[in-house]
């Protein structure tokens, strides 16, 4: 596996007036997964002062569709989530904790890996047993579930919900933006209908624009019926008029970040 580091002082190339990537990033190329039987790329975005205090540990946010998160040059349609800018802005304003962000690149199996399928189960196992294990061993993380979140949009939002729901002992926070809750004939809702155990200790961020309006509202209502409390267990947001793309998710990224990691 090759590792490429991009430090703050080397990242001043601009893309249409804005800096491509802000902060310290380590790119991990072609990490072999025994579980998936393929090589995967991911990046680890580190807090600005990560190297200044060797004793400090940080919460971690795992995100899907890694190529779309911090660099418009690698992102779909040339627009990224601006995760690096938003986290930096909020931490500099002392509104949220410093965190580590791990962005897992997708591949041709994205649809199946992000769903409740055999490949989806393998992807979840890869995240926990291989990727998270590697990140926790190499970086100064707060590895417990209370300091570990997962987030994505569209199918990545569905994946985040499923991963946290099935593994609350690992992920206690799930950011589900414009999620594809409709996928596979509303299977995720059938799963919730069949659940009769005590409420799982997970914080959910649920949002949508005009896309997914009915399913997003349905998920919020269903979780509320199951005992999840708005403002404590759930943050719900309807972005009126918003389309289904990276630019829109970038505009409201501060909401889940503050809900999960706000001071």
Where do the model's predicted regions map?
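Non-catalytic cap/lid and distal C-terminal segments of serine-dependent acyl enzymes
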Residues: 2-263
């Amino acid at each position: 596996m090759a590792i490429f580091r991009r430090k703050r002082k080397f990242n001043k190339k601009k893309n249409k007036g804005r800096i491509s990537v802000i902060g310290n990033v380590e790119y991990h190329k072609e990490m072999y997964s025994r579980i998936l039987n393929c090589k995967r790329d991911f990046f680890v975005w580190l807090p600005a002062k990560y190297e200044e205090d060797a004793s400090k540990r940080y919460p971690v946010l795992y995100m899907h569709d890694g190529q779309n998160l911090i660099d418009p040059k690698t992102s779909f349609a040339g627009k990224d989530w601006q995760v690096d800018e938003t986290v930096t802005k909020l931490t500099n304003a002392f509104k949220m904790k410093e965190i580590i962000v791990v962005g897992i690149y997708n591949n041709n199996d994205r649809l199946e890996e992000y769903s409740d399928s055999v490949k989806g189960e393998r992807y979840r196992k890869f995240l926990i047993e291989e990727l998270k294990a590697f990140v926790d061993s190499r970086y100064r993380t707060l590895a417990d579930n209370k300091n570990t979140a997962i987030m994505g949009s569209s199918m990545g939002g569905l994946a985040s919900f499923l991963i946290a729901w099935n593994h609350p002992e690992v992920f206690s926070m799930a950011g589900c933006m414009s999620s594809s809750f409709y996928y596979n004939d509303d299977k995720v809702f059938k799963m919730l209908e069949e659940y009769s155990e005590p409420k799982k200790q997970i914080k959910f961020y649920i949002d949508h624009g005009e896309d997914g309006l009915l399913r997003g509202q349905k998920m919020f209502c269903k979780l509320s019926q199951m005992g999840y409390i708005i403002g404590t267990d759930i943050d719900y947001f309807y972005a009126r008029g918003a389309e289904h793309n990276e630019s829109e998710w970038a505009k409201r990224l501060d909401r889940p970040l503050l809900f999960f990691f706000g001071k």
